[in-house]
Design a protein with these regions (language model features):
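N-terminal [4Fe-4S]-dependent radical SAM core
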Residues: 1-87, 325-326
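Acidic (Asp/Glu)-rich catalytic clusters
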Residues: 77-79, 106-114, 134-144, 176-180
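Generic structural signal for well-ordered alpha-helices
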Residues: 67-74, 103-108, 133-137, 171-175, ...
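Hydrophobic faces of well-ordered beta-strands that scaffold small-molecule active sites
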Residues: 25-29, 86-88, 119-121, 145-149, ...
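Conserved C-terminal portion of the radical SAM core fold
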Residues: 169-229, 247-270
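Auxiliary Fe-S-binding modules of radical SAM enzymes
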Residues: 2-16, 20-25, 215, 223-326
């Protein structure tokens, strides 16, 4: 097969086109939640790597209503794509960690904003009570809905070290329960967490492939100023491997994707943080520049998603904007 026609991996824009005949953009929201490993329920201080300022746009302020945040987010994109529609992305902290009626009000307020065509709800695998899941199951019948779980690692030792406050068994249960309700279920993982080797991380792809995940976000570990992990790095830098050369990370990602189930949609490969907060790694690349390098390297290696996945019998290819298999 000609490598130029092959779909190197299942990408998110192609996935969205299955649901929407128009351009769709996520708008991040900060709805004023916290996390059980921050407020003392399961721990204090939150995840050791976390500083929510790294992914909250300027319009995300808890003193602003959901409607105001969405309207300001729309203004940010409208000048370039006036016909664009939006997904309200409840991103900051744990967006299911509150009383049910309050959650319903926030979700439903977002859906009343003109141009909002669905919800993406980011949360933890230990914060999906049955009552909320039943509500989301019903909501899913009326609007586009995706629940995105912060998995971060499949290794319980790592999860404990980074103060997640949950286990991988919690992830398995939450993902299975959510997907069983017919809800699109996504995951988020971090490559390069302390104590994890190249082989450990690549093996993780096969483990996650056993779950009914529709999408997966991958990103590199970033050291962020003011976090507990940044302090740990100052104390013992030898315990960290930060992919200071982008080529090393690209090759790891390719190895990972080759072992990933072919139908999982890979939503992203890297995270970007404000320069004033980022300690390392700083590759000086925009997301599209990273993706271009990744795709070039995949073609050089003859790599594609699922190439080494244990149950892979078909190759997914891309031709004339249509997904096909051979």
């Amino acid at each position: 097969m000609n490598m130029s026609t092959q779909l190197l991996y299942n990408d998110f824009p192609t996935f969205l086109r299955k649901y929407f005949p128009y351009k769709v953009q996520k708008i991040s929201l900060n709805a004023g939640f916290t996390c059980p490993n921050r407020d003392g329920t399961k721990g204090w201080g939150g995840c050791t790597y976390c500083n929510n300022q790294t992914f909250n746009p300027d319009y995300c302020r808890t003193e602003k209503s959901i409607t105001t945040q969405l309207e300001e987010g729309k203004c940010f994109f409208a000048h370039k794509y006036p016909e664009m529609k939006y997904l309200a992305y409840f991103q900051a902290y744990t967006n299911t960690y509150a009383e049910l009626e309050g959650l319903k009000r926030k979700y439903e307020e977002a859906l009343t904003v003109d141009g909002a065509v669905g919800l993406v709800i980011g949360t933890r695998p230990d914060c999906m009570p049955e009552s909320l899941l039943r509500y989301l199951e019903e909501l899913n019948k009326h609007t586009f809905l995706m629940v995105e779980y912060g998995i971060e690692s499949t290794c319980d030792e790592t999860l404990k070290r980074i103060n997640r406050g949950h286990t991988y068994a919690d992830t398995v249960e939450a993902v299975q329960r959510t997907a069983a309700c017919g809800i699109l279920t996504g995951g988020h993982i971090i490559l390069g967490l302390p104590g994890e080797t190249h082989d450990t991380m690549v093996a993780q792809a096969e483990i996650l492939s056993d779950l009914p995940l529709a999408t997966l976000k991958i990103h590199q570990l970033q050291l962020i100023r003011g976090t507990r992990m940044a302090h740990e790095y100052d104390e013992a830098p030898d315990g960290f491997y930060l992919f200071n050369e982008v080529e090393e990370y690209i090759d790891l990602v390719i190895d990972y994707v080759e072992h990933l189930r072919p139908d999982i949609v890979v939503e992203r490969f890297v995270s970007q943080s404000p320069k004033d907060l980022l300690i390392a790694p700083d590759w000086g690349l925009k997301n599209y520049e990273f993706v271009a390098r990744l795709q070039k390297r995949m073609k050089e290696r003859g790599a594609y998603q699922g190439k080494k996945y244990r149950d892979s019998e078909k190759r997914i290819i891309f031709a004339d904007d249509k997904l096909t298999t051979e």
